[in-house]
Each structure stands twice: as C-alpha cells, then as structure tokens.
Amino acid sequence: FSPKVQYKFEYDVHNGQVLDAVIKWNFAGNWNLWFGQTKMPGNIERVFSSQKLQLVDRSLLNKYFTLDRDAGFQLRHKLNLGETFLVRSKLAVSQGEGLNRKAWSSGNSYTGRIELLPFGNFTKKGDYFASDLKREETPKLMLSVTYDYNDNATRQGGQMGNDIAGSTRDLRSIQADAHFKYRGLSFFGEYANRVATDGDAVNDLGEVYHTGSALNLQGGYLFKNNWELAGRYT
C-alpha cells in the first residue's frame, strides 16, 4: 500500500518451516522499523544468503556462535558522514529463542550492531555476498561490532542449539568482523566470544552452553573468466 512499507516471507519447503516473516517500515528519513521473524544483526557470514556463499557451507564459528534468526523488533538507521563515510546502526529486542518458537519466552535477547563503511556503499549490496562478483573499482571496506545479551537462554547457543531442561544461564556475546573487496579480491574475518554471566557453562543437569571464542578468516580472488580461488581458516 506504500513504498515505505515492505514485507518479506521465506518458507523452507524441504524442512517445512517459516524462515522469514517480517514487515519493514521506513517511518522517517533513514530510520526503519522491522517487526517479525528474520535474521538478527549478527556476524556477517550468517547474514550472507545461502545462495551467496563463497564456499559450500558456513564456518564452525557460525555454527556455534551465530545469532541466526529470531522474532521481535529491529530498529535500523544509516548516517552519512561526508561524501563517502557511512555508518549503519541496528538495535534489536527479540524473544531470544530462535526460529518458530511457540511458547512464551522466559527472557529476551537484546542486540546492538554498528557497521562502519569508510569508503561508502559496496556495489549492488556487495557487502552482503562473499565473493567480489561486481569487481569493485575502488577499495570497499566494512568494519562491524555486535553485542548481544540473551536473558535466561533456554537453548545452548541462545537462538541455536539443543533445548536446555535444567537451570538456565544469561549469555553475553561479542562479535567483530571486517569485510574488504577490490577488483576481484575479497576477504572477511570474524571473531566471536560468548560467556555465561551468571554461572558455569555446564548446568545442574550437565547440559553445556556454547561458550568460548572463535576466529574465522576467509578470502578469495575472482578471475576475469569467473573462476575463483578461495580458502578459509577457522
């Protein structure tokens, strides 16, 4: 009904579940409010769509530390500083338990992410796919930090992992990533750390939360004939 209101719906036919069901409202200038279930503003590798990965799967860092998808609200803003410098900020309050949870949440997740693009936007949203498919004519860089606090997490990784039957923990996650592209060359690096703030990572029933640290480094070079040499260290 209005170009200021958009929606996205994505259904996983294979597993029979809703992935995205979100409404996006551009309510003022560079401010947007999202409501529904969608990807959280977390590590950059998870934000890449499955069809836009550089390798056949995501890393072990993503497996254990991603915020994945969740249901709730997201407030997003972008700010231009000078001719090229772009700052994007994202805040989220979500149920903290991941995809398609029908029971009432026992505690919420609070997330903040800031993205700095000193050389301006990537070509055609190139910051959200891994390879330099657009062969950036000038260097492009994104530096980002994410903070998440999951209150009374009922799954091993907050939004991911097995359900917790015993005593729960509050989880604090910090993530940082960098993404660079220039003339076929691409690189991104990610760091993640998660701790349980109110007790050991192992609860009274011996259930283990996904805590600790991880590092993921990935890069490649796309030749002009569209063959690419790429690798990863995690």
Name each model-derived stretch.
Residues F1-L99, A103-G120, P139-M142, T211, ...:
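Outer membrane beta-barrel
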Residues S105-G107, E115-F119, T123-T234:
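Detector for outer-membrane/organellar transmembrane beta-barrel domains
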